[in-house]
Amino acid sequence: RDDMKIVELLPGSGWYTKLLVPVVEENGEYYAALGTSRISESLIGQPGCEKAKITAEDSKSYRKEGARSYSLETNGLGVTDADMVLTFRNYHNFGPEGRAAMNKVSFDALKSGGIYAVVDHTRRHMEGDNDENRRRIDPVLAIKEIEAAGFEFVDFATLHFKPDDELRYEVGRKTVTGNTDRWTLKFVKP
């Protein structure tokens, strides 16, 4: 809805930001949090994004030398009454502790009844780590982790279902880039 207060986590270069901000710019609020350096320099304050705000600027995401996944240090998102928190294709970048921190601050940022929406690349259920699946994550694992943070699982969408993706190749391979199977999950804060 155009009157929502939304928080986008890890917006990268702002591909989704450019879709979200115009929807809420007049009647709602848009906040970007965690890993916002690229959009804060190139997008925030520009035409069409004048009212968009950066929050949780003191948060840090980093990968220790030799580590497969990122860690997250944050004291919160700086918002406590959001209608929706969204994150697109980056849940897989974090290890269990980083994902737990992301889920906790998302829970804390939402008002009761608020929506937590997560989209990421599909990994086969219970498949171990390897070089080809490091940027994929098991949706069942994600559901369990997000529920453990206090959320209630509401629904999933098949919007990004790609039956031709064999779930065996790195998402950056030319043969699958842009055509990966992705899961889209919706949770609510009770």
Q: Where does each model-flagged region fall?
A:
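Conserved beta-strand signature within the Rossmann-like core of class I S-adenosyl-L-methionine
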Residues: 31, 113-125
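A short acidic, Gly/Pro-enriched loop at the edge of an enzyme's catalytic core
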Residues: 75-85
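A short glycine-rich, Lys/Arg-flanked "PGG" loop and its adjoining helix->strand segment in the class I
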Residues: 21-22, 100-113
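A short, conserved alpha-helix within the catalytic core of class I
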Residues: 69-72, 93-106
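Conserved class I S-adenosyl-L-methionine
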Residues: 2-12
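Short glycine-dipeptide loop
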Residues: 2-3, 26-27, 110-116
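Core SAM-dependent methyltransferase catalytic element
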Residues: 149, 164-190
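Conserved Class I S-adenosyl-L-methionine
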Residues: 129-156
